[in-house]
Regions:
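Surface-exposed, Lys/Arg-rich phosphate-binding patches that contact polyanionic backbones
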Residues: 116-136
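A short amphipathic beta-strand at an alpha->beta junction
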Residues: 71-98
């Protein structure tokens, strides 16, 4: 089975297994060597016209929190089935009104070889107080690049 076929199998299984009422559209499935991330779109809360950004933001926070709490037991059961079937841990997340929230996901150590100029960049981030260690500085840099790519998209 090719990588693409495996991805399609996982996506199809989750599409068939997830309750239809959970999400307003198709889920986004991301797979790497350790984890399957399932991110679904939630309905935007009805706030009425003329509400402040703070009220709208609080409504989105409430919608995300309610989904997380209300679906916890079923998500755990589905994740266990998927972990047994596909051999990967499952992480859950939602997207609501452009805000993405991941509930639980793996933090996996990644080994890399860096030359001195690259290590100096990490050391500068540590010295500036951006990170406590080279590892944390590297994670910070990856998050920064990811955020910039989202803005550019």
């Amino acid at each position: 089975m090719t990588h693409e076929e495996a991805h399609e199998t996982v996506r199809g299984w989750f599409t068939g297994r997830l309750p239809e009422e959970w999400f307003t559209g198709p889920v986004e499935i991301t797979i790497d060597r350790e984890e399957i991330a399932v991110i679904g779109p939630l309905a935007t809360p009805e706030t009425g016209e003329g509400v402040s950004d703070a009220e709208r933001s609080a409504a989105v926070d409430g919608r995300i929190k309610a989904f997380r709490e209300d679906t916890r037991d079923r998500r755990i059961a589905i994740a266990r089935e998927a972990e047994h079937r596909f051999g990967h841990k499952v992480a859950w997340g939602v997207d609501c009104e452009g805000r993405r929230a991941l509930f639980t996901h793996l933090s996996v150590p990644v080994m890399t070889r860096l030359r001195q100029p690259e290590r100096r960049v990490l050391d500068t981030l540590v010295e500036a107080g951006v990170a406590r260690s080279r590892s944390e500085a590297l994670a910070w840099a990856v998050r920064l690049v990811t955020a910039q790519r989202r803005l550019a998209a």
